[in-house]
């Protein structure tokens, strides 16, 4: 019995050691010389592809700043590997260590906080409706009997269903595997509306073939804090990321990045997203925090 108990204790200690090592991002990248950034193909001006394996955007720049400080902590130059993620696989890829830092368009909510950690909110988003400019739709109440697009694995799916129950409106959900696919459903006429974060809608409209053909309408369906995601229970890396973002907020650098990506022309077509920072976003910059979206709903 004593032998079995000792063996069990050793096994548990060994497992704990592996876990500690697995969640120590600074030690991991120092050993490998590589840091893996989770990126999105079409998350508006937050994170998107330029083609040929290149990615850019508001969150990409913030993550690059964090990685610069990660290099200082690791004491070496790191190779940055881009790992495209989707709304469905982003959390599992952070959990299993494939992705070290996810720089897309992820909503921080209480359910996700059980599985991953979030750095301070970089902007507070409002979920809205995009339609064709020729459409008469101005509210979710007018979506009865219509095909409504959204992206698989996003909080907008829950938002749609919640509003459907609350309003008694009966519409058919059609899903894109990523935001560009969801927008294509609207663009091609297979859906009459696309429900998603306003910045993502604005970004996809801005980079579409004919931006004037689309508009964002309707009431705010949900208010959601968007943040960069990292592995849970990694105190050292979380502090490094928090300190980096807090300094960017304090210095005004993050406001300048917002202007660069959401107000000024952006590559590759030099189009403007034209999406001003909300008062809630500015409040998050003034008082950095990692509160989940449920806290915003209480206000």
Where are these regions (language model features)?
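Acidic, polar ligand-binding/catalytic clefts
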Residues: 75-142, 282-294
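A ligand-binding cleft/hinge motif common to bilobed small-molecule-binding domains
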Residues: 89, 104-114, 159-166, 184-188, ...
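Ligand-binding clefts/hinges and TM-proximal coupling segments of bilobed small-molecule sensing domains
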Residues: 30, 155-174, 212-214, 246-299
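Bilobed "Venus flytrap"/periplasmic-binding protein-like clamshell domains
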Residues: 36-45, 55-72, 107, 125-183, ...
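Periplasmic-binding protein-like
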Residues: 41, 123-134, 206-245, 264-288
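Extracytoplasmic small-molecule ligand-binding "clamshell" domains
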Residues: 22-102
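Short beta-strand-to-loop elements that line the ligand-binding cleft
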Residues: 74-86, 169-178, 218
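Extended ligand-binding regions for polar small-molecule ligands
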Residues: 61-69, 141-142, 146-147, 152-154, ...
């Amino acid at each position: 019995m004593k032998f079995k108990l000792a063996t069990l204790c050793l096994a548990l200690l060994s497992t704990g050691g592996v876990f500690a090592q697995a969640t120590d991002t600074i030690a991991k990248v120092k050993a490998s010389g590589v840091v893996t950034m989770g990126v999105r193909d079409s998350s508006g001006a937050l994170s998107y592809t330029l083609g040929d394996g290149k990615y850019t955007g508001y969150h990409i720049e913030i993550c690059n700043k964090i990685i610069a400080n990660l290099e200082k902590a690791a004491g070496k130059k790191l190779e940055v590997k881009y790992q495209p993620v989707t709304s469905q696989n982003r959390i599992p890829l952070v959990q299993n260590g494939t992705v070290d830092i996810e720089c897309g368009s992820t909503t921080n909510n209480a359910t996700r906080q059980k599985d991953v950690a979030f750095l301070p909110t970089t902007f507070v988003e409002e979920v809205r409706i995009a339609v064709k400019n020729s459409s008469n739709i101005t509210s979710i109440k007018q979506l009865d009997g219509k095909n409504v697009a959204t992206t698989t694995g996003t909080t907008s799916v829950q938002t749609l269903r919640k509003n459907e129950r609350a309003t008694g409106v009966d519409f058919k959900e059609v899903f894109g595997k990523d935001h560009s696919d969801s927008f294509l459903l609207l663009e091609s006429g297979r859906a009459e509306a696309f429900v998603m974060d306003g910045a993502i809608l604005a970004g996809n409209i801005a980079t579409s073939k004919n931006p004037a053909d689309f508009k964002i309408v309707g009431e705010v369906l949900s208010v959601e804090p968007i943040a960069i995601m990292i592995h849970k229970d990694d105190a050292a890396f979380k502090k490094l990321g928090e300190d980096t973002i807090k300094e960017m907020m304090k210095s005004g650098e993050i406001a300048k990045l917002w202007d660069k990506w959401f107000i000024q022309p952006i590559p590759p077509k030099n189009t403007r997203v034209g999406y001003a920072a909300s008062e809630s976003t500015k409040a998050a910059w003034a008082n950095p925090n990692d509160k989940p979206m449920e806290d915003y709903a209480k206000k």
